[in-house]
C-alpha cells in the first residue's frame, strides 16, 4: 500500500535540520498534491509566543493542504508504525523518541478502504494513549478524530476536484486547539497575536507561499493591513 503524509503546516517547509532530513529521507516531495481539507488557525502555540498554528476543524470551510507520498511501501502494521514515529519525530523536532503523541497533539491515521485491517491495529496500538487523543473541539462541531486516533473526516479530494487515488492511507498530525468559550478565536485575534510577536508571522506567510491556505487568510491579511500598512513584515500573497 502507498502511504501519504497529510500536511497542514510547517513540517512541509521548515528548514530545521530534523525536518529537512525527514522530508529528504522519507517523502517524495516532488510528488506533493494539493488537497481540500477543513483547516484553520486554531492553536496558540507556546513555542511561538502564543501565535496561532494550524488545526483540523470539522466546521471549517475547506482550505488547501498537502499530501506527500512516502518513499517506502506499507506492507505491514510495523511499516505503518515506522512512518508514524518518523512523522512524530519531525513534528516534535526530536532525534529520538518511541512516541507518536503527547498532550498537545498526536499522530492520526485515515484509511481509504474502511475494511482495511490497519485501522483496527492502529486503534489497538493507541489504546494506551487515549488522553493524548482526546483533543478538544468547538461546542458546535463534531470532533476531527476519535479516541483511537482515526481521522473523522471524509477522504480528501484534490483541490481541482479530482479524486485522490495516489495513496491508500494518510498519516497526519492533529494538534490540540486553543478554545475561548467553547469556540475558536476569530481572524482579528489571530492577526493581533502575530502583530504583537511579528518574529513568528513567518508561519502564516510561509504556509501561503507554499500553498497551504485557509478560509481565514484574506481576513487575517486584512487585519494586518488595517493595523499597519504593509502588514507585519511578510510578503503580500
Positions of predicted regions on the chain:
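Glycine-aromatic micro-motifs
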Residues: 1-237
Amino acid at each position: 500500500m502507498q502511504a501519504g503524509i497529510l500536511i497542514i503546516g510547517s513540517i512541509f517547509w521548515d528548514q530545521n535540520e530534523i525536518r529537512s532530513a525527514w522530508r529528504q529521507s522519507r517523502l517524495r516531495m516532488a510528488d506533493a498534491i494539493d488537497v481540500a481539507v477543513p483547516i484553520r488557525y486554531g492553536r496558540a502555540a507556546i513555542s511561538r509566543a502564543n501565535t496561532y498554528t494550524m488545526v483540523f476543524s470539522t466546521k471549517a470551510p475547506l482550505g488547501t493542504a498537502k499530501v506527500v507520498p512516502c518513499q517506502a511501501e506499507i506492507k505491514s502494521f510495523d511499516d505503518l508504525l515506522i512512518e508514524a514515529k518518523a512523522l512524530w519525530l519531525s513534528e516534535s523536532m526530536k532525534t529520538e523518541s518511541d512516541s507518536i503523541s503527547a498532550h498537545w497533539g498526536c499522530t492520526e491515521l485515515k484509511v481509504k478502504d474502511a475494511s482495511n485491517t490497519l485501522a483496527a491495529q492502529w486503534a489497538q496500538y493507541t489504546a494506551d494513549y487515549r488522553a493524548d487523543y482526546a483533543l478538544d473541539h468547538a461546542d458546535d462541531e463534531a470532533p476531527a478524530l476519535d479516541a483511537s486516533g482515526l481521522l473523522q473526516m471524509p477522504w480528501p479530494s484534490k483541490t481541482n476536484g479530482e479524486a485522490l487515488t495516489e495513496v491508500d492511507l494518510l498519516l497526519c498530525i492533529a494538534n490540540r486547539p486553543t478554545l475561548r468559550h467553547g469556540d475558536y478565536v476569530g481572524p482579528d485575534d489571530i492577526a493581533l497575536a502575530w502583530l504583537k510577536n511579528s518574529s513568528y508571522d513567518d508561519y502564516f506567510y510561509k504556509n501561503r507561499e507554499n500553498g497551504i491556505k485557509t478560509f481565514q487568510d484574506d481576513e487575517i491579511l486584512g487585519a494586518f493591513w488595517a493595523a499597519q500598512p504593509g502588514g507585519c513584515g511578510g510578503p503580500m500573497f
